[in-house]
Swiss-Prot record:
Protein name per the record: Sodium/calcium exchanger MaX1
InterPro entries, per database record: K/Na/Ca-exchanger, NaCa_Exmemb, NCX_ion-bd_dom_sf
Protein family (similarity comment): Belongs to the Ca(2+):cation antiporter (CaCA) (TC 2.A.19) family.
This protein's record includes keyword Transferase: no
Annotated function: Catalyzes Na(+)/Ca(2+) exchange. The transport is electrogenic with a likely stoichiometry of 3 or more Na(+) for each Ca(2+). Is K(+)-independent.
Chief location category: membrane
């Protein structure tokens, strides 16, 4: 019986990860064929592509009111992204860093971790606080895509906070929607009746089928992966927070691991590191935010006093390593990996 449950757990993870991969590819292809702008593709697909497993599993856990799995997944994924993934990538090849990684994305990543810690102090992430996280994520994406020219390249943390509290992202969203609506109207006037058939050619129908199939795989995979994770947590007497922080977190971080290690090995250190930092921001602002919109998320004592402070600490260490010679060296990768191993050891003994 336990063997069957374990196989279902693994199968759910495979469906989750591979389904996410095919979902992003097919959705991106469809969007381009339909003439959707690169901005919208980036906003909806590229920005959250590697975080879809965390998103699906967290929402599935939230619906089942398994708050420990949700928070453990997000916090554990963020720790694994830095300690395990950046550590392994830096060990394979030193990664060049840039000042924007520190003063913009790095500080926003740290801000998201600290803000979650502040919200968690009453042992609950309310639906209002979750909504604020989602707004922060929307503002962050619009800030990156829309404000580069206005700030002449100076897109740092201070500018982001100003941008958010002045609600400039609302104007950006309205302008973008109006612009897309006008372009679509012009396109409709200039098109003929044969365009619909042309879209179905070149594999469009196949892309739609792949999208639907991959979406189903994500939903099914998330459902069974979370259910079996809860089963093993109860069977072994392990808190669901621990299961979420380890098994679920590492399992759903596989896309980040593959992308980051691949980029590092090919010499694209900035892409590798940008993927990790972006994923960590997405995990808290978008995934934790959306998950908290279903039900308020209760915060376990372990999450409040151990795993979340560890997440903040390892984020700080990463920022320090980013600024030392603007390169993450191999020995720094080893330090991050040792930090992660030490975290796991302490986690299972407290």
């Amino acid at each position: 019986m336990i063997t069957v449950n374990f196989l279902i757990l693994l199968l759910g993870l495979v469906f989750l990860v591979k389904g996410s991969d095919y979902f992003v590819k097919s959705a991106s292809t469809i969007a381009k064929k339909l003439g959707v702008s690169e901005f919208v593709i980036g906003l909806t697909l590229v920005a959250i592509g590697t975080s879809i497993p965390e998103l699906a599993s967290s929402i599935a856990a939230s619906i089942q009111q398994a708050s420990g799995i949700v928070i453990g997944n997000v916090v554990g994924s963020n720790i694994a992204n830095v300690g395990l993934i950046v550590g392994v990538a830096a060990l394979l090849s030193p990664m060049k860093t840039e000042i924007d990684m520190l003063k913009r994305d790095g500080y926003i990543m740290l801000f998201s971790a600290v803000l979650f810690f502040v919200f968690a102090f009453n042992r609950e992430l309310s639906m209002l606080e979750a909504g604020l996280f989602v707004l922060l994520y929307i503002a962050y994406v619009f800030f990156l895509f829309e404000e580069a020219e206005k700030y002449e390249g100076k897109l740092h943390f201070k500018e982001f906070i100003t941008y958010f509290f002045k609600f400039k992202y609302i104007n950006s969203a309205m302008q973008k929607l109006n612009g897309n609506r006008n372009r679509n109207s012009d396109s409709d006037r200039n098109s003929d009746s044969g365009n619909g058939n042309e879209r179905l050619e070149g594999g469009f129908a196949k892309d739609i089928f792949t999208l639907v199939l991959s979406c189903a795989a994500i939903v099914i995979g998330a459902k069974y992966f979370v259910e079996e994770s809860i089963f093993f947590a109860e069977l072994l007497g392990i808190p669901d927070t621990v299961i979420g922080t380890t098994l679920v977190a590492v399992g759903t971080s596989l896309p980040e691991l593959v992308v980051t290690v691949s980029a590092a090995r090919q010499g694209y250190g900035s892409i590798a590191l940008g993927n990790v930092i972006g994923s960590n921001i997405t995990n808290i602002f978008l995934i934790l935010g959306l998950s908290g919109l279903f039900y308020p998320l209760s915060v376990a004592e372990m999450s409040l006093f151990f795993t979340t402070p560890v997440m903040i600490a390892i984020s700080l260490i990463l920022l320090i390593f980013i600024s030392t010679g603007w390169e993450i060296k191999r020995w720094e990768g080893v330090v991050l990996m040792m930090f992660y191993v030490a975290f796991l050891v302490v986690l299972f003994y407290i």
